[in-house]
Amino acid sequence: YKLICYYTSWSQYREGDGSCFPDAIDPFLCTHVIYSFANISNNEIDTWEWNDVTLYDTLNTLKNRNPKLKTLLSVGGWNFGPERFSAIASKTQSRRTFIKSVPPFLRTHGFDGLDLAWLYPGRRDKRHLTTLVKEMKAEFIREAQAGTEQLLLSAAVSAGKIAIDRGYDIAQISRHLDFISLLTYDFHGAWRQTVGHHSPLFAGNEDASSRFSNADYAVSYMLRLGAPANKLVMGIPTFGRSFTLASSKTDVGAPVSGPGVPGRFTKEKGILAYYEICDFLHGATTHRFRDQQVPYATKGNQWVAYDDQESVKNKARYLKNRQLAGAMVWALDLDDFRGTFCGQNLTFPLTSAVKDVLAEV
């Protein structure tokens, strides 16, 4: 099974023990590590951070210790406007320029492939995304004729039914991609007026709106649309989503007044790294959604949906049962990468739990 792990370059800026550089990554933990994110400037792939080139090198040095490790560079992301992708992909010339710029950039910096993180293509972008994927793959095939190992091509795809229907020709893009990472962890956020889990494995009985909003539905839907199981990778989060409660109610459907308070290290409302959640759990009340098979915790007026070792192991068992290609983890730097927060003296407790299940016969 593949275990595809994202690393985010901005995690270097978190203070103190939250700061994560690629040398913190265990080279044997994942089969693939994806560096997020690269930029596009003048229609060519480019660095984003001032020190990206140094960090690329630090990451790719991990392959000295584990020569089997593959690394990919992800282009795009949430802060990269989807309309910028549209502009490049919709015109033959700019698309050509972008595609041509990719192999030399990846080779120069020691990457094994490219991950497309166009979040998210709109209705008009559907055929342009297909063309981009098809032409990028053709370029990778052409480039490998020189005798080098062919570059890998993957894509991160929304797990929401509406977004899938709108932006992706799944059957077509699947033919040209080496794997597809399904972002099965953004099903519920602080934009909702009530509490709910962002990464349930199955639908909840209580919640009519959750019929489509769970990993099981998304996986089944993708397979039905023509994604081959052996190319489909299921996303598992190492972060939680937090809410500020608007009343004393804490169960399903409890009203919220907004996102939860920012974490000490990640400093973003409504989101917490697993290592911050381990801190939060001291003195908190924990619960589990039996049907959705994911935990949540409350303390004061804060309500946090998250994943723990039990829930990620369940998800790993599920994807093995569905005979998928493997699991994807977002992100290594949000797991307890130092092993100092979650009390087991174990680095990357969630990612390791997934790895353990994938390794079981």
From Swiss-Prot:
Keyword RNA-binding: no
Any single biological process term in GO: response to mechanical stimulus
Cell location: Secreted, Extracellular space; Cytoplasm; Cytoplasm, Perinuclear region; Endoplasmic reticulum
Keywords on record: Antimicrobial, Apoptosis, Cytoplasm, Disulfide bond, Endoplasmic reticulum, Glycoprotein, Inflammatory response, Lectin, Secreted
Binding-site positions, chitin: E49, W50, G76, G77, W78, N79, Y120, L183, T184, Y185, D186, R241, W330
GO CC term (a single one): extracellular space
Sugar-modified residues: N39, N345
Job description of the protein: Carbohydrate-binding lectin with a preference for chitin. Has no chitinase activity. May play a role in tissue remodeling and in the capacity of cells to respond to and cope with changes in their environment. Plays a role in T-helper cell type 2 (Th2) inflammatory response and IL-13-induced inflammation, regulating allergen sensitization, inflammatory cell apoptosis, dendritic cell accumulation and M2 macrophage differentiation. Facilitates invasion of pathogenic enteric bacteria into colonic mucosa and lymphoid organs.
Family statement drawn from the similarity comment of this UniProt entry: Belongs to the glycosyl hydrolase 18 family.
PANTHER family: CHITINASE (PTHR11177), CHITINASE-3-LIKE PROTEIN 1 (PTHR11177:SF202)
Quaternary structure (record): Monomer.
Protein name from the UniProt record: Chitinase-3-like protein 1
Organism of this sequence: Ovis aries (Sheep)
